[in-house]
């Protein structure tokens, strides 16, 4: 009978190595998987699978620490982070470490400490991974039943899910603790151009927090990506932290309901597919967040958003031409619309020119110049501060765009300056990885469903035409 994990279910392709290559004492004949299938050989060996996962965690943490130290070693304090291709230091700076007013780096030692701690942690994880992969028991069920499991044990699986949720909840609350009790976080909206600030009054109101989830993802609504203040971000982490903790406790103390037992496929590959689907969704959300949001991802560290760079260019030339004597309130552009200022369809005063498409941008360097009806003409004439001019000029020349023509009026010839914005890197990489993880989700979900239904889709090797053809030589 072809049971769920029987090697006979897989009809392996015959290769040169099938009978000869054995990795770690496990070959294709005994496991049903070739050497390159990696952890699939360990599906029913909980001890060895633990070793693989711990070692993998060690590799991840080692990358984080080593890359962190690499960025610290190459960091130039006089240049903005986004001009130096940094992707880790901006995250640490956003947490309020090592920075002061305006996002200026005043101390790199916390970044060094972070890198060293990660490298040391990776050594501990690496040792644990090697131990469990080579020395530790192959299965945990006999020696350590609390850590052992069988994939089909629905109650054990939801208990493991619950433990993960509790840990995630505490992780969310760590950010809350940093923001509220341990020195605060960097707030790009702090008066005068951003500063590290203790969040003393996080948002608890569920109508505000869950209102983001009920927003449209399109246009100016922006779903959760539209969050524009640190109080809501920290309040959201308070809510999600406790939801994860209480949800985790629920999954630990309860057994799956009948409808859940019927609805889900309960196998290792099914859990893999669920996880890949969840990570894919997180990747797509992260892509949008880092591309559009300048509160969670402050422009001082990650560079301006696309709309922000475009609006910054319009603002920079408005400042220049106003100094040269232009009347910014009445000057016409080549299309007959306002050259510097115009009205949006709903009546607000906005920047003119190509940047009109980004009229609903909100940025800390621009908001002080708004009035009750959009940009305030009198403020633009009298109240522009030097820091606003400097910042907009900097953002104008560091758009997160690579295009042969202009986008939103910003000159973006990619060969002109050796610069790629961290926003471009982070959003593109998360979109691409999110897509690949989604494909992997579909792949493993299809295999898991097929296995649960008692068949395996694939080529029937026994009647494959190539087997009846004469050898090439």
Curated annotation (Swiss-Prot):
UniProt xrefs under InterPro entries: PS_antenna-like, PS_II_antenna-like_sf, PSII_PsbC, PSII_PsbC_sf
A GO cellular component annotation in the UniProt record: chloroplast thylakoid membrane
Record key words, sorted: Acetylation, Chlorophyll, Chloroplast, Chromophore, Manganese, Membrane, Metal-binding, Phosphoprotein, Photosynthesis, Photosystem II, Plastid, Thylakoid, Transmembrane, Transmembrane helix
Membrane topology designation: Multi-pass membrane protein
Top-level lineage group: Eukaryota
Binding residues annotated for [CaMn4O5] cluster, in chain numbering: 367
Pfam families on file: PSII
Modified residues (Phosphothreonine): 15
Molecular function GO labels: chlorophyll binding; electron transporter, transferring electrons within the cyclic electron transport pathway of photosynthesis activity; metal ion binding
Compartments where found: Plastid, Chloroplast thylakoid membrane
Propeptide stretch(es), residue numbers: 1-14
Cofactor, how bound (note): Binds multiple chlorophylls and provides some of the ligands for the Ca-4Mn-5O cluster of the oxygen-evolving complex. It may also provide a ligand for a Cl- that is required for oxygen evolution. PSII binds additional chlorophylls, carotenoids and specific lipids.
Transmembrane intervals: 69-93, 134-155, 178-200, 255-275, 291-312, 447-471
Main localisation: plastid
BP-aspect Gene Ontology terms: photosynthetic electron transport in photosystem II
Sites of N-acetylthreonine modification: 15
Role of this protein: One of the components of the core complex of photosystem II (PSII). It binds chlorophyll and helps catalyze the primary light-induced photochemical processes of PSII. PSII is a light-driven water:plastoquinone oxidoreductase, using light energy to abstract electrons from H(2)O, generating O(2) and a proton gradient subsequently used for ATP formation.
NCBIfam families: psbC
Family: Belongs to the PsbB/PsbC family. PsbC subfamily.
Subunit structure: PSII is composed of 1 copy each of membrane proteins PsbA, PsbB, PsbC, PsbD, PsbE, PsbF, PsbH, PsbI, PsbJ, PsbK, PsbL, PsbM, PsbT, PsbX, PsbY, PsbZ, Psb30/Ycf12, at least 3 peripheral proteins of the oxygen-evolving complex and a large number of cofactors. It forms dimeric complexes.
Name listed for the protein in its UniProt record: Photosystem II CP43 reaction center protein
Organism of this sequence: Chaetosphaeridium globosum (Charophycean green alga)
């Amino acid at each position: 009978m072809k049971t769920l994990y029987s090697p006979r279910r897989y009809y392996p392709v015959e290769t040169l190595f099938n009978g000869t290559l054995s990795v770690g004492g496990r070959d294709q004949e005994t496991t049903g998987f070739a050497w390159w299938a990696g952890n699939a050989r360990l599906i029913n060996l909980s001890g060895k699978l633990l070793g693989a996962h711990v070692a993998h965690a060690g590799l991840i943490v080692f990358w984080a620490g080593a890359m962190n130290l690499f960025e610290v070693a190459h960091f130039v304090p006089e240049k903005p982070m986004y001009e130096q291709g940094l992707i880790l230091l901006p995250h640490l700076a956003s947490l309020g470490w090592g920075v002061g007013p305006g996002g200026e780096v005043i101390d790199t030692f916390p970044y060094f400490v972070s890198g060293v701690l990660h490298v040391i942690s990776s050594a501990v994880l690496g040792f644990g991974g090697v131990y469990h992969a080579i020395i530790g028991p192959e299965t945990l069920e006999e020696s350590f039943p609390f850590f052992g499991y069988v994939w089909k044990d629905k109650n054990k699986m939801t208990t493991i899910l619950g433990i993960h949720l509790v840990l995630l909840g505490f992780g969310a609350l760590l950010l809350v603790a940093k923001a509220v009790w341990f020195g605060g976080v960097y707030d790009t909206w702090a008066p005068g151009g951003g500063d590290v600030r203790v969040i003393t009054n996080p948002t608890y109101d569920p109508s505000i927090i869950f209102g983001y989830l009920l927003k449209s993802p399109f246009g100016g609504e922006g779903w959760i990506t539209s969050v524009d203040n640190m109080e809501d971000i920290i309040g959201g982490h308070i809510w999600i932290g406790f939801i994860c903790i209480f949800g985790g406790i629920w999954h630990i103390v309860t057994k799956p309901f009948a409808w859940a037992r019927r609805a889900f496929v309960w196998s290792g590959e099914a859990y893999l597919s669920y996880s890949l689907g969840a990570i894919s969704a997180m990747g797509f959300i992260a892509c949008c967040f880092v591309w559009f949001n300048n509160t969670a991802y402050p422009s001082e560290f990650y560079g301006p958003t696309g709309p922000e760079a475009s609006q910054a260019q319009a603002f920079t030339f408005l400042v220049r031409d106003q100094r040269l004597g232009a009347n910014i309130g009445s000057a016409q552009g080549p299309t007959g619309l306002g050259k510097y200022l115009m009205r949006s369809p709903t009546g607000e005063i906005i920047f003119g020119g190509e940047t009109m498409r980004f009229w609903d941008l909100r940025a800390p360097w621009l908001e002080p110049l708004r009035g009750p009806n959009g940009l305030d003409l009198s403020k633009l004439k009298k109240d522009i501060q030097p820091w606003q001019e400097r910042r907009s000029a900097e953002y104008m020349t560091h758009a997160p765009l690579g295009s042969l023509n202009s986008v939103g009026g910003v000159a973006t010839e990619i060969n002109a300056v050796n610069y790629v914005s961290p926003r471009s890197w982070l959003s593109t990489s998360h979109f691409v990885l999110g897509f690949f993880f989604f494909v992997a989700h579909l792949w493993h979900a299809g295999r898991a469903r097929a296995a649960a239904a008692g068949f395996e889709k694939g080529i029937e090797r026994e009647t494959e035409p190539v087997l009846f053809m004469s050898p090439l030589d």
